[in-house]
């Protein structure tokens, strides 16, 4: 890279390692709440100025009400029998991260697609910052192209880079990792 390098990791510069266990407790309780499909009282985990920052299709939500009205409720309406399975969680001070999948049934409208009744796997990554026992920020990446593909809509029109390999349709599952046995 030529020229000056961009500043790296500035959001975690003042991280407090002593907060790790408190952060773990908040995130684990919040994930349990989401798995229990709590809406009315889920606010106990989020700060007043909570921000939820997602990729295209998810959007940016400011505050719990906007998160619930423009993410949590529509998501639950589109997908029933949903369970969240974090395949890995990492905790470091005020920060937590997870990746995993939600397994669900497409039972309501989703991006203009009427319910199909198909079981889908929704892969995601979450990064949270917890301050004073509340989630203040949540960065989210949801693999909507994969969900749409499972519902019969290839947003890449067959030109996705997975087609550059000898085995383009392989379905990776973490339980297939050789060191997991």
Predicted regions: what they are:
Residues 1-181:
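C-terminal and inter-domain tail/linker signature
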């Amino acid at each position: 890279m030529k020229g000056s390098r961009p500043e790296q990791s500035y959001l975690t510069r003042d991280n407090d390692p002593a907060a790790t266990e408190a952060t773990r407790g908040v995130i684990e309780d919040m994930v349990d709440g989401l798995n229990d499909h709590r809406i009315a009282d889920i606010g106990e985990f989020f700060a007043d100025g909570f921000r939820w920052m997602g990729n295209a299709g998810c959007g940016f939500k400011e505050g719990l009400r906007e998160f619930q009205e423009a993410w949590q409720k529509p998501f639950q309406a589109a997908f029933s029998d949903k369970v969240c399975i974090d395949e890995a969680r990492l905790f470091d001070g005020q920060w937590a991260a997870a990746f995993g999948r939600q397994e669900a049934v497409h039972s309501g409208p989703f991006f203009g697609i009427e319910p199909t009744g198909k079981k889908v796997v929704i892969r995601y990554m979450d990064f949270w910052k917890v301050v004073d026992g509340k989630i203040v920020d949540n960065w989210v990446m949801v693999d909507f192209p994969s969900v749409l593909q499972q519902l019969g809509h290839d947003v890449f029109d067959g030109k996705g880079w997975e087609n550059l390999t000898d085995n383009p349709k392989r379905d990776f599952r973490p339980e297939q990792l050789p060191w997991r046995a």
